């Protein structure tokens, strides 16, 4: 029996060792503090973002969703520029910042590098999309479409919904339905769909577990 065990270990030892290493890494990840998975800079903005979202959306506003979105957009870096020209914490293109400031003059002049302005404009812009995305199955699907619109434009979301309807799918459901349809370029499709899924299914639950208010609209 001992010889059989030695022979088995010689044949499968490497595989067993790799499995043990992966198991150890998984256990290590599970027992890491939730805050360790959130950029340290986020903590400095938590109180202000909570106040802004509750003012714009009500006391039950989805603070965790907005935090997850900023995490995805800029990793909480207020002075960052993207390769395509998006600016600041909420990564607005200059034309979008200007447009938001024009339709919401109470926000003052466009200031995408100002964290306060960027967070309020983000909450307002998300609300703008939310109000224009009716007839969805639930809050999860509506948030998915609102985030897709923030990333790629409301026009594209509306076109994708029409394609879903034409194919016999439910235009009120994003996941597994509308998300499958588009005429966007391949790179734009991949970026947009990852954007929505990563924010709602990965980052929002993380911020919720860390105590950011509003909860996660999608059950993961």
Residue positions per predicted region:
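Non-catalytic cell-wall polysaccharide-engagement segments
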Residues: 3-20, 24-44, 95-124, 128-220
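Short, histidine-centered active-site or binding-site loop motifs used for metal coordination
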Residues: 32, 51, 73
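Peri-catalytic and regulatory segments of divalent metal-dependent proteins
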Residues: 45-57, 80-81
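Short, charged helix-capping/linker segments at alpha-helix termini
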Residues: 53-63, 135
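Extracytoplasmic
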Residues: 61-65, 71, 84-87, 143
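Cell-wall polysaccharide-cleaving catalytic domain and substrate-binding groove, primarily
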Residues: 71-96, 153, 199
């Amino acid at each position: 029996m001992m010889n059989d065990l030695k022979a088995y270990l010689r044949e499968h030892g490497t595989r067993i060792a790799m499995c043990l290493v992966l198991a150890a890494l998984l256990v290590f990840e599970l027992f890491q503090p939730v805050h360790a998975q959130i950029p340290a800079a986020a903590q400095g903005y938590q109180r202000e973002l909570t106040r802004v979202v509750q003012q714009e959306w009500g006391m039950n506003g989805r603070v965790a969703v907005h935090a997850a979105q900023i995490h995805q957009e800029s990793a909480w870096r207020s002075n960052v520029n993207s390769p395509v020209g998006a600016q600041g914490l909420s990564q607005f293109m200059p034309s979008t910042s200007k447009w938001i400031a024009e339709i919401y003059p109470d926000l003052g002049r466009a200031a995408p590098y100002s964290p306060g302005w960027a967070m309020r404009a983000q909450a307002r812009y998300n609300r703008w999309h939310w109000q224009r995305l009716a007839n969805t199955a639930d809050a999860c699907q509506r948030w998915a479409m609102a985030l897709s619109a923030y990333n790629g434009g409301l026009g594209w979301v509306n076109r994708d919904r029409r394609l879903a309807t034409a194919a016999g799918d439910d235009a009120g459901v994003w996941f597994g339905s509308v998300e499958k349809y588009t005429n966007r370029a391949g790179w734009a499709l991949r970026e947009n769909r990852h954007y929505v899924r990563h924010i709602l299914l990965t980052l929002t639950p993380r911020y919720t577990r860390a105590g950011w208010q509003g909860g996660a609209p999608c059950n993961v």
